[in-house]
Regions:
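Residues forming the flavin
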Residues: 1-50, 56-185, 189-531
Length: 531
């Protein structure tokens, strides 16, 4: 297959025009072509005149001619499917492998192990998805939090209540495998070709449940409401684990807890394992009218039916730190994402249609090991302190209400909230607060500098009605559990740190890929347990 890139067309163009232009670029007659299709579609909104930019996949009737044809065209490349060959190991497992965590990393590790006959045992501290959705909705309506069933914990992990983005910067061939699995389990076909694919929280839930059911159909077991509470070791080798519901003998454990499993991190450190302090970020959720964002991005073309909902990704270096936007949710809402009592955490979520009035994105500033003397316990304590401050600042408006402030007020340190055209969407309600007072002064000032820079990139970013809601503290894991090149923990044989919580991923796609890598490492070393 040949990929013909940079096919630029006006918004009014249809797919057949892209196909014809691709064949013209290749200088190949249609009579020689077996198939054409869209491989990628993006929008170039620069210079105020948005264009559709296609990458077209072309398959010839004589595939042997494709290499020479692609070689003579600067905008073409020969695409060969990545080889995902698995080589089974010979060292017999005495016990079935255990996967701890059913977020993207654990889900895909368990799926690959199950497809190869390893019948994994999967432990998830939260409930199955239907019960989890009920718990989240109950918290949103009443402010009654279940610490093990919320937006952070339960089947699917934290990404289940998000925009369902499948974008990544890792460039791994396993991304195609992840996309195929999502498609096999009901994700919309467009994720295969959109430049910025997303599933949406509504559709993602069914996909996750379907993948879990495949794991079970292949002999895997899933134990919900079963938190990891301890490790059993002998001569530097993992030999078993303790959970809230009993013990399991195992010599391989995929440690794929999420970034909010603070009690589990503490258990590891208390048991003698050393965790590193890893960079993460803190800040707020910014809300604007989606229509205003699109006017700034698309100019006169805003509202054209060929254009996707407007998205942005901004960053600005301020001294030694970086202020950047994270998890931008077009047409979405800000959601209460606490997993601990009397702490407020914000996050963003949107449905597949992205039809809400507001755009939201985290606006955060980086912090790292030097801020905490490279002590992971201090980093976690910092997160908790900020979340407790946010809870106290919003408490007058109700349990888990959030502090909020207009962007202009934050820039001027006034602590005021005026509700105008932008209606805050945080589901537990908001109240006016001085957000700058909730953060260390240097971080607040750095965020202010970043926001001022954003106004130069997106007109209206600091508009009077724009709102900040706080605090955003769970952008990524604050810790990392070191592993070797074979993915085994440097401190304990048989323990496989994996995914976002262990410090090796950020987002659904990269976490899923890391789960596949870890599963592949186990498969290449061990033969399945008998019986």
């Amino acid at each position: 297959m040949i990929l013909v890139r940079n096919i630029r067309l006006p918004l009014s163009a249809a797919e057949p025009q892209a196909f014809e232009k691709a064949l013209h670029t290749l200088r190949v007659p249609r009579s020689k072509v077996e198939h054409t299709g869209v491989a990628k579609l993006s929008v170039d909104a620069r210079h105020g005149q948005p264009k559709l930019v296609y990458t077209v996949a072309v398959t010839l009737k004589q595939p042997g001619e494709e290499a020479a044809l692609a070689a003579r065209c600067p905008d073409a490349v020969l695409h060969r499917r990545a080889d995902f060959t698995l080589h089974a190991g010979t060292q017999p497992l005495a016990h079935r492998p255990v996967v701890c965590g059913l977020g993207p990393a654990g889900l895909f590790a368990a799926l690959l192990l199950a497809r190869q006959g390893y019948r994994p045992i999967v432990l998830e501290r939260g409930p199955a998805l239907d019960a989890r959705v009920q718990a989240v909705e109950h918290f949103s309506a009443t402010g009654q939090l279940d610490p093990n069933a919320n937006i952070q914990f339960g089947e699917g992990g934290a990404g289940t209540f998000s925009d369902g983005k499948l974008t990544t910067r890792i460039g791994d061939e396993l991304c195609d495998f992840v996309t195929e699995v999502f498609l096999q389990h009901g994700a919309p076909a467009e994720i295969a070709w959109k430049q910025k694919p997303h599933v949406g929280t509504d559709l993602l839930r069914g996909v996750i449940t379907s993948i879990r059911k495949e794991i079970e159909s292949l002999g895997g077991e899933v134990h919900f409401n079963t938190a990891l509470t301890g490790l059993e070791r002998k001569n530097g080798q993992l030999v078993g684990i303790a959970t809230a519901n009993g013990s399991f003998a195992c010599e391989t454990l995929v440690f794929a807890v999420g970034h909010s499993a603070r009690d589990t991190f503490s258990m590891l450190m208390d048991s003698g394992l050393v965790l590193e302090c890893k960079p993460f970020s803190v800040g707020f959720r910014a809300e604007h009218l989606q229509s205003e964002i699109e006017k700034s991005l698309y100019h006169e073309a805003a509202g054209h039916p060929a254009l996707p909902r407007g998205e942005y990704q901004l960053s600005q270096h301020v001294g030694d730190r970086c202020v950047y936007t994270f998890c931008m949710c077009p047409g979405g809402q800000v959601v209460a994402s606490a997993s601990e009592e009397e702490r407020v955490v914000t996050n963003g979520m949107s449905y597949h249609a992205r039809s809400g009035k507001n755009a939201n994105a985290a606006v955060v500033v980086s912090v790292g090991g030097a801020d905490f003397a490279n002590d992971p316990r201090r980093a976690i304590a910092f997160q908790r302190e900020l979340e407790a401050k946010a809870y106290a600042a919003g408490r007058a408006a109700g349990a888990y209400a959030a502090p909020a402030e207009n962007v202009q007020s934050f820039l001027e340190g006034r602590g005021q909230l005026h509700i105008g055209s932008v209606q805050p969407t945080y589901d537990r309600g908001v109240t006016a607060a001085d957000l700058g007072a909730l953060l260390p002064g240097e971080l607040a000032d750095t965020l202010r500098a970043g926001l001022r820079a954003y106004e130069r990139k997106i007109a209206g970013y600091t508009a009077p009605d724009a709102i900040l809601t706080g605090l955003e503290t769970r952008t990524s894991s604050p810790v990392r559990l070191k592993r070797e090149e074979d993915f085994v923990c440097t401190q304990l044989a048989g323990l496989y740190p994996c995914g976002e919580g262990a410090g090796y991923a950020g987002g659904i796609m990269s976490a899923a890929v890391d789960g596949l890598r870890v599963a592949r490492a186990i498969i290449s070393r061990y033969a399945p347990a008998e019986g």
